[in-house]
Amino acid sequence: MTEAIKERVGALLATGLRNYWYPVLPSWRLHAAPLGITRLGENIVLWRDKDGTLHAIEDRCPHRGARLSLGWNLGDRVACWYHGIEINGSGTVTNVPAVKACPLEGQQCLKHYPVQETRGGIFVWFGDALHSEPSPLELPEQLASDDWASMLCTAMWECNHQYAVDNVMDPMHGAYLHARSHSMAMGDKQAEMRVKKTPHGIMFEKIGQREVNFDWVELADTGSMWMRLSIPYQKKHGPGGSFYIIGYATPIDENHVQVFFWRCRKVSGWQRDTWRFLYRNRLEGLHWEVLEQDHVVLENLAPNARQNEFLYQHDTGMARVRRMFEQKAEAQLAALDAVAKPSATTV
């Protein structure tokens, strides 16, 4: 890889790989008014129409650049606060009320984003110029099956999203950073680990220890890039066995990330109700304590920590994921370059 390509790959990874679905908000965060967000370095306005259908377009009025998120929700379109220009969910200007027969009307001026809502989260497709149409959003069993109950926890951290991915791909830190937690106080402080291929990615696991601590983690690519792990739970923590977590690290910009963690257990009927009650009234606070430990460490890493590392065997899974991401970034850039390069003409 040349230095020029390396820089471009680094820049792409800093704000996130394209051509994936990313969770951008919990559902409860979007109310009647348009909402402006920044994700993957792109400014987006989201809103719901009268039927609850979601829309997402660039947060920029094509007239003079005002934020559409400061304007009004008109159902299937938003109106700019500055001059009242109306734009629909496809990014097309439908009305310029201040003048007659404005040539701006009817033009698709803004990028629109495919958007889906599931399991209490809002997902947006971030496609590059070659992939405006989304791939299917295929979620892991814990989110796709009604046999599982899930609750979403999300937080914003002041660090690059790659550090959040590194953190989840590092099971060994559970025995140290989270050693006094309600769920990761047991197990060996030393372990041998291995990488295993899965149908959609990799699993990184401790050898000879399972269902004792944070003993394994999986990363998979199924239209979105998700991570899965399980934490053993004692019977006093309610029915459903081990507690599964489905995690995402969505870039906000180069220096901020929003993490999403769906907490899942396989329960139904009265057991589901019991677990939800226990979680909301007892367990949720304990999990926030664990998450805050990760938060504090990641926000206080040494400057440019990734450029000054000495990795060892426990970092193998993390290193494999880093290389996987680099290869995907190289492939995305190469595909864009191939289209942009003028074709040779024969004389």
Where are these regions (language model features)?
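Residues at beta-strand starts and edge strands
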Residues: 18, 33, 120, 243, ...
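Short, charged N-terminal helix-start/capping segments
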Residues: 1-13, 255-265
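Short small/polar-residue motifs
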Residues: 20-24, 42-44, 109-116, 186-194, ...
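Rieske [2Fe-2S] iron-sulfur-binding domain
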Residues: 2-4, 9-10, 16, 23-149, ...
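Short, positively charged
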Residues: 13-17, 268-270
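C-terminal catalytic domain of Rieske-type non-heme iron oxygenases
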Residues: 53, 130-347
